[in-house]
Regions:
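Alpha-helical transmembrane segments of multi-pass inner-membrane proteins
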Residues: 19-21, 74, 99-100, 112-140, ...
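Membrane-embedded alpha-helical segments of multi-pass membrane proteins
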Residues: 29-48, 90-102, 153-162, 203-210, ...
Length: 392
C-alpha cells in the first residue's frame, strides 16, 4: 500500500493508458474502462496544472492539422444520407480514438515511465503473438488472431511494430530492459506470423525491416550480419514449409485466389461509389449499407464489410474532401518527423514515422486500419510515447 499511495497522478495516468493498450484486444470493455479513467485523470491533471502546463510544440502543430482534418470530414457526417448514423460514427472513429495521443503528450513526461510503458506493452504483445501461434497449431483455427478482434488486426500491429523493434535493438538510446522486451516481442512475432498466416505481414515486414535498419547497418558491419542472418533464418524457415510457400506465392495470384479477387471487386465498387459521390462520398458509417444495396458486384460473394484499403475506402465513404483531410493530418506527422530525423538522426522521430507509415500507409493498402479501434489507439500510443521520449 505504501508504494501505491506514493504514486503520483502522472504515474496513475501512465498505468491506466498502459492497461488500456494491453487489454484493448483481449477485452474491449476492459480497455474502454481504463481508457475512460485515463481521460478523466488527465482532465484533472490538466486543470491542476492549468497555469503552467507544458504543451509540446508537436502537439500545437498536429492539433492544427487534426482540426483541419475534422473540418474536411464533417460534411461527410452531416450532409449525406443519414446524419443519425454519420455523426455518431464521426465521433467514434475520428474523435474518440485519438485522446490517448493527447493524454500521453500533455500528462506524461518522465522518461523512465515512458520507457516502462513501452516495455510492458512489448511483453504483452509477445504473449498476444504466442496465443495466435497456439490457436493455429492446436487446430483451433486456420489463422490465429491472438487476444481478439480480426486476424488482420494483429497482422497490422506486426507490420507497425516489427520495424520499431529493430530500431530499438539497433540504437543505443534505449535502455537494456526496453531492448530485452523488444527482443522478446520480436521473437514471439516470428511464431505469431506462423500462426496468423497473413501474407501482408510477411511481405511488408521483409520490405520494411531492411529499410529502417539501413541507417544502422551502414555504420557497423556486425549489424549487416545480424540483420541478414535474421532475415535469412526467417525466409529459410518458411521456405521449408510447402503450405507457406504456396500461400506466399498466392500474393500475385489475380485469377483464382478468392481473397485477392474479393479485394479487386470491392475496390472497384468503392471507386464506383466515389465516381457517383466525388466530394463527400456516401457518408461516414454508411459505406457498407450502400455497398450491399447498390454497389456490390455479383462476383463478390464474401459480403465484405469494407474496402480492405484505407484510401479506396475513404474515397467511397468521405470523398475527396475527407481523403484530403486525412492525408494532410498523417502526412504532416510524417514530414515533420522526417525533417527532425534528418537533422538529429534520433531514433524517436524515426519510430514515430514508422508507426504512421506502416500502420496507415503500408498495411493500409490491404486493410482498412483506420477503422480498427484497438489498432489505431495502439498506433497513437506508440506515436505519442516516442515523441515524448524525444522531447524529454
Amino acid at each position: 500500500m505504501g508504494v501505491v499511495s506514493k504514486l503520483g497522478l502522472e504515474s496513475w495516468i501512465a498505468i491506466m493508458i498502459t492497461l488500456m493498450v494491453c487489454l484493448t484486444r483481449l477485452s474491449m470493455a476492459a480497455g474502454q474502462v481504463f481508457y475512460v479513467i485515463a481521460i478523466l485523470l488527465s482532465i484533472f491533471y490538466i486543470w491542476k496544472h492549468r497555469h503552467g502546463l507544458y504543451v509540446p510544440s508537436y502537439v500545437k502543430k498536429y492539433s492544427k492539422t487534426f482540426a483541419l482534418m475534422l473540418l474536411l470530414l464533417l460534411p461527410s457526417a452531416v450532409l449525406t444520407n443519414n446524419i443519425a448514423v454519420g455523426l455518431p460514427e464521426f465521433i467514434n472513429v475520428w474523435l474518440w480514438r485519438i485522446p490517448v495521443f493527447f493524454v500521453i503528450a500533455l500528462c506524461i513526461r518522465d522518461k523512465k515511465t515512458l520507457f516502462t510503458m513501452l516495455a510492458v506493452f512489448f511483453v504483452d504483445f509477445g504473449i498476444d503473438n504466442l496465443v495466435a501461434f497456439y490457436q493455429h497449431v492446436s487446430g483451433m483455427t486456420d489463422r490465429g488472431w491472438g487476444f481478439g478482434s480480426s486476424v488482420l488486426t494483429i497482422s497490422g500491429l506486426m507490420v507497425m511494430l516489427v520495424p520499431i523493434f529493430c530500431v530499438i535493438l539497433l540504437d543505443s538510446a534505449f535502455p537494456s530492459y526496453v531492448k530485452a522486451s523488444a527482443l522478446w516481442a520480436l521473437g514471439c512475432v516470428g511464431f505469431g506470423m506462423y500462426g496468423n498466416q497473413s501474407r501482408g505481414s510477411w511481405l511488408f515486414s521483409m520490405i520494411m525491416v531492411p529499410i529502417v535498419s539501413l541507417p544502422y547497418i551502414l555504420k557497423r558491419f556486425i549489424y549487416v550480419v545480424v540483420v541478414l542472418a535474421a532475415l535469412g533464418g526467417v525466409v529459410w524457415g518458411f521456405s521449408t514449409q510447402p503450405q507457406y510457400v504456396a500461400r506466399f506465392e498466392s500474393i500475385t495470384n489475380t485469377t483464382t485466389d478468392g481473397s485477392n479477387l474479393g479485394r479487386f471487386d470491392v475496390w472497384t465498387s468503392s471507386i464506383n461509389m466515389f465516381k457517383d459521390h466525388p466530394v463527400t462520398g456516401v457518408g461516414i458509417g454508411q459505406w457498407r449499407t450502400i455497398y450491399e444495396v447498390s454497389y456490390r458486384l455479383p462476383t463478390e460473394n464474401q459480403h465484405l464489410y469494407h474496402a480492405h484499403n484505407n484510401f479506396i475506402q475513404l474515397l467511397g465513404e468521405v470523398g475527396l474532401l475527407g481523403l484530403l483531410g486525412v492525408l494532410i493530418f498523417y502526412g504532416s506527422i510524417i514530414v515533420d518527423n522526417f525533417v527532425i530525423w534528418v537533422k538529429k538522426r534520433d531514433p524517436y522521430s524515426l519510430c514515430a514515422m514508422i508507426a504512421v507509415i506502416c500502420y496507415v500507409f503500408v498495411f493500409g493498402q490491404v486493410e482498412y486500419t483506420l477503422d480498427n479501434s484497438s489498432g489505431i489507439r495502439i498506433m497513437y500510443f506508440m506515436l505519442a510515447t516516442m515523441l515524448q521520449l524525444r522531447d524529454n
